């Protein structure tokens, strides 16, 4: 697009957004490249009008999340960034079974806080829930809290309303939705923008946290593999290496923790005890388990700066031991958290504890 068309397109967009448009070139924090402008829509109609202009002048659009993703697509070259901060409406509906509908700018923790008084929870939500938004995490199709039972986020989105390039709005479900959400796409590859999502929920008024300590990484890995192979009906399963355990103020050694519905206790308690004993783990008291559970959002708490050293790796169960050893080669002070999915995939987030200032905690 030549400069004359750039100017024409920007004038059309400014006519839609007024002072909610910031002209560029704009280089947003945690993005790569430069965009022509940033806009902040307040409703779906404005997104449709923006997409019409984008289609007419053939420039890309990219949603700008809350900056919690460590591998999100960058700013589109000669395109427009879309902030959804002003589109954060949350609606809860249903009787015996609830569902929640949210706009892309809604923070995940706000959804949880709205569901909690009803005794319900999201089936899956990110460990960065205090900051992450619905649209931002949906773009990464992540693994998070609840993925041991429910899998990836896209498997738990009942439907999503999207605005395609050109301005058409469609509702996507199932495989069509999963094809639309493709982590790793550049802004230029994006087919459109998510403007709303209906999310799966679960009963959560009697969840039971648990935690176990391990001295050696091979024992931790063995316990994880055993729980997965046995199909123990946990809702969530995660682990920390010694660096992350210290950063969270939870002691030393390796920590395996998670949660399950109380009604499953007859199936779970014995399986946990047997697994931990056979892999030289120590089941921790309830108070310590609840404390570990309460720290599940670290290091994305609102009071802490966004980490700068994170590396995100997805590994199969069979390569976990090797991946944990490799973190020591990349940093003298690694701090690792792992999330286990029902597929056997494990999401590793590796940080440099010294760079983040956690060695002083």
Question: Model segments located where?
Answer:
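FAD-binding subdomain of flavoenzyme oxidoreductases
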Residues: 89-93, 102-238
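Glycine-rich N-terminal segment of FAD-binding domains in flavoprotein oxidoreductases
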Residues: 23-87, 104, 122-124, 350
